[in-house]
Amino acid sequence: MLLAAHAAGVDLERASAALAYIEAPAGRGRRENLRVAEGQITLIDESYNANPASMQAALDLLGSARVSDVGRRIAVLGDMLELGAQSIALHSGLADHIERNSVDVVFAAGNHMRHLFDALPERIRGAWAPRASELHAPVIEAIHGGDIVMVKGSNGSRMGPLVAALRDHFRARPASAEG
């Protein structure tokens, strides 16, 4: 963007300052802080689409996120769709990437993600469900202050409504409410 601004003769200092206010679209990396009883969490919404490369990039992003002393990195993952015969290997193969990125808890939705969930060490398994809608309650119950929660999956895996449920649940709670 800055290269295009420079080519158009725009002042780069002003252009870079303006870029600081651009927010990622919903489902494509939007970050927001939500209130929980113990403080706040950071929600990273990557719910619009997923393929092996974008899933690894999102896990790298989660792994690079700084968490507080009490916070955890939580990945809530839905199926990557339309992968054909390689689907099982591509889903279960994410386990190494998850461990390398110090993800503390993984929730998984969908029949393809079951292969990943089964490949994970027991200590980081949150819950698996056949549908994302069945993870709403377990994810909400697991979250506490300081956590960074990333939600990612193919659009067809319906992770967007889970993001909306998290937003609605935690925005509706006053910061001082009991947990």
Segments predicted by a language model, with ranges:
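ATP-dependent carboxylate-amine ligase
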Residues: 2-179
